Amino acid sequence: MNKNTISNIECVITKPDRHNLITVIVETESGVTGYGCATFQQRPLAVKTMVDEYLKPLLIGKDANNIEDLWQMMMVNAYWRNGPVINNAISGVDMALWDIKAKIANMPLHQLFGGKSRDAIQVYTHATSDTMEGLYEQVDKYLEQGYQHIRCQLGFYGGVPENIQTAQNPTQGSYYDQDQYIENTVEMFKNLREKYGKQFHILHDVHERLFPNQAIQFAKQIEQYNPFFIEDILPPSQTEWLDNIRNQSSVSLALGELFNNPEEWKALIINRRVDFIRCHVSQIGGITPALKLGHFCESFGVRIAWHCPPDMTPIGAAVNTHLNVHLHNAAIQEHVEYKANTQRVFPNAAEPINGYLYASEIAGIGVEMDREAAQDFPVEYRPHEWTQSRLPDGSIHTP
């Protein structure tokens, strides 16, 4: 294969709607350009610095064909490795290199992987409201749109705070009460099943808001309502407790959106402590490690449900869809409808059809960034109050 030298790398941050989205653009001497997602919205400028000041000088003049070698070099070049900033920066480059290779081959990305194992991937979306009436309205809307899987949340992560008794002069933060959350969420499941029966699969995200003993109690209480899966019932630092949950409840567990390092998921998969891996592809370093993770999971009967929130580019979401139609053990894809500005900056962003997402058949990833449109929405940093989650006594808890 003829050498295809990397001639330029650019990292662009744009905020078309609520989130700062990071795109890496890799140009080659052949004239083929690739696009990749590097979004770490809580620390966007750190990722851009990593790309501009460290990866770009390292990669200019290298052969874009050698994706595996370049990925390994980027990962070890700083000596310390596998953190959210460096992994997202590497991911942006890695996805762009795969985009280039698929464009040169004149085939959509999933065909470069080895083709499809399914026609389309089932999708779930988010229904969230402070009241059951509001939640019913959202569920009804999504059922009309053909969704068979809906993530249901009563209030924001941690639930709707009601008359929380805090300490005097409480420290600033986002307060919630774990006992209230458990009680209200179990009641939410009960109400949904009574109203809808088994018309759709219910998913729910605990978002690490419980202590391990509470997580066990919660899993036991909602088991009767047969959720499709419960996400992030514990933080990555407490995954040994998953064995205790497994021993007392048959609830399907999904975990992984906070993982960066393979050591965080190896034991979970080998010991079958989870049913679904929820890794965020750019947080683990891009397509190259995602393919390896997918095949590793398949050997142990663990299914894939990549993290795919609105705070990632439609480029990254399209990569998830290509992975999902290829990997035989892919189960479902998360999706939140794109707003108009995001669709303008990222043309060809896919939307579900009757509860399914279809991979693009355009050569490459199939979604690019309109650089001129992106300039209309410059980066705007915000302090992220929601990650300052506090219990009634004022102590910080994992968000």
Swiss-Prot record:
GO terms for molecular function: magnesium ion binding. It comes from the Bacteria. Gene3D superfamilies: Enolase-like C-terminal domain, Enolase-like, N-terminal domain. Pfam families: MR_MLE_C, MR_MLE_N. Keywords: Magnesium, Metal-binding. SMART domains: MR_MLE (SM00922). Mg(2+) binds at D205, E231, E257. InterPro entries: D-mannonate_dehydratase-like, DgoD-like, Enolase-like_C_sf, Enolase-like_N, Enolase_C-like, Mandel_Rmase/mucon_lact_enz_CS, Mandelate_racemase_C, Mandelate_racemase_N_dom. GO terms for biological process: amino acid catabolic process. D-arabinonate binds at H207, E257, R278, H307, E334. Has no detectable activity with D-mannonate and with a panel of 70 other acid sugars (in vitro), in spite of the conservation of the residues that are expected to be important for catalytic activity and cofactor binding. May have evolved a divergent function. Homotetramer. Belongs to the mandelate racemase/muconate lactonizing enzyme family. GalD subfamily. This is D-galactonate dehydratase family member VME_00770. It comes from Vibrio harveyi (strain 1DA3).
